Curated annotation (Swiss-Prot):
Homodimer. The active site is at 201 (tele-phosphohistidine intermediate), 517 (proton donor). Belongs to the PEP-utilizing enzyme family. Transmembrane segments: none annotated. The reaction takes place in three steps, mediated by a phosphocarrier histidine residue located on the surface of the central domain. The two first partial reactions are catalyzed at an active site located on the N-terminal domain, and the third partial reaction is catalyzed at an active site located on the C-terminal domain. For catalytic turnover, the central domain swivels from the concave surface of the N-terminal domain to that of the C-terminal domain. One of its GO terms (biological process) is phosphoenolpyruvate-dependent sugar phosphotransferase system. The gene is phbI. Its EC number is 2.7.3.9. Mg(2+) binds at residues 446, 470. Keywords: Cytoplasm, Kinase, Magnesium, Metal-binding, Phosphotransferase system, Sugar transport, Transferase, Transport. This is Phosphoenolpyruvate-protein phosphotransferase. The keyword Repressor does not apply. The N-terminal domain contains the HPr binding site, the central domain the pyrophosphate/phosphate carrier histidine, and the C-terminal domain the pyruvate binding site.
Amino acid sequence: MPFALHGIPVSRGVAIGRAHLLAPAALDVSHYLVDEDQLDAEVERLRAARAAVRAELAALKRDLPRDAPEELGAFLDVHAMILDDEALAREPEALIRGRRYNAEWALTTRLEELMRQFDEIEDEYLRERKTDIRQVVERILKALAGAPVLVPAPVPALAADGEAATGVIVVAHDIAPADMLQFRHTVFHGFVTDMGGRTSHTAIVARSLDIPAAVGVQSASELIRQDDWIIIDGDAGLVIVDPTAIILEEYRHRQSERALEKKRLQRLRHTPAVTLDGLEIDLLANIEMAEDAGAALAAGAVGVGLFRSEFLFMNRRDELPGEDEQFQAYRGAVDAMHGLPVTIRTIDIGADKPLDARGDEFETALNPALGLRAIRWSLSEPGMFLTQLRALLRASAFGPVRLLVPMLAHASEIDQTLALIAKAKRQLDERGEAYDPGMKVGAMIEIPAAVLLLPLFLRKMDFLSIGTNDLIQYTLAIDRADNAVAHLFDPLHPAVLQLVARTIREANRAGVPVAVCGEMAGDPSMTRLLLGMGLREFSMHPAQLLRVKQEILHAHCERLEPLVDQVLQAFDPEEQAAALRQLARP
């Protein structure tokens, strides 16, 4: 009997095959006290398990093909960094020696503490990083149990007609990027998970490998049985179990069309993004580490529109990264882009994204999303902020760098930020350090107050970048982490569209460059809408770039503008839907 499950679409395409169920690592471990004379041996047992995981991750990275997206190796590096972090190394050992916990108990105790910290994070992307920590802990637990650190690869099942299947669909409560990479040479054609969101590393790897996927499919691993025949509709986040012959035929046809589309898209990699009426559009990439620059270039990005610097600051127990460490990371991205511009956002962290090294400063925040975060926190820590500013300025000596400041809302915040940048320049002058004295400084527009103060921002800042994810959240008063109201998170809400359009149009009139760097920029269904508002600079995940470029190549901006005006004037849902249909490409 066919039935359908609904989840979150994270990677487009259609996958057809038999279900291969992955059992999660057991986190319900035994708890017992270790004898005093066995404490050293228990610590060594934990260290040996971590060493086994480290060796497996290194082997996976070593075996990556030369043409693999660079971000895949970067994700393995992230797991290796988490593995060696004191939170999973020294602190569990302290629990073994101090409380006589067995290794599994010590490890899961620390995991529970970390999970509570990450649950307080408002930002969806950073909140999803707790999944990476859990996945690393699961690997260590497997090693402690003597099980293989990497899950066994699936084997081909039989199709309905008895012939060998074209692939299998991995179904799991969750699946780590490293496991996905292990499957790359097998018949693994897609995956379905109970957990996850659009910004999880698993979802990002799926997009990088162009593997159809649906995540957040509640109870999928319980409702789907081993060897069930299933279809993933990655565009809709739909999973069809035991489909009829008619449904199978329909989706096989979609697969064929998708294969042709992929070939056409690849031919666009080196095609300039120019509209039918001759307007050049800049397509840039969002990255989180220097290693991601390769994927940006491979997709045809003309620069980095958002380098999230906060990842240098995460998972540190005792101290924040120093100036030289930050400089090397920023310069790495600049060098990797070979003269193309790199926009680096200053640390966007705080009460809703607590750092391990400063976590106690934020424990009393009653509403962390509205608390001491982003530029508010940077200005409250001028010593830390000056260190980052000096590192950013030094990197600007090696290529075009733009500095982007998050969550600005007050004139005083702008003035304080610019004053500290000037102070950082004076400090570098005193040291004889090189930097670009004309480095551009821009503002994130992600709070409604910033839109209402646009004349001030346009007078004092060199460029603007609209962070649509936070702008939607703050405009609609929606907590994206709360499933009870998540359905109200609507990028097409008339109020949101009014704010985005106003920002773009006023910036254009003032001659100030403006970009969109949130999820709206990478959604091809939004491309024509944003073009009609006047947007000429998009920044997105590299995997989204070619589909957005395809929309741009078929767009005529002058003709889109009156259609977009109709969308902006439609406040009734039915009227808006009709206006959007008029806007859609025929």
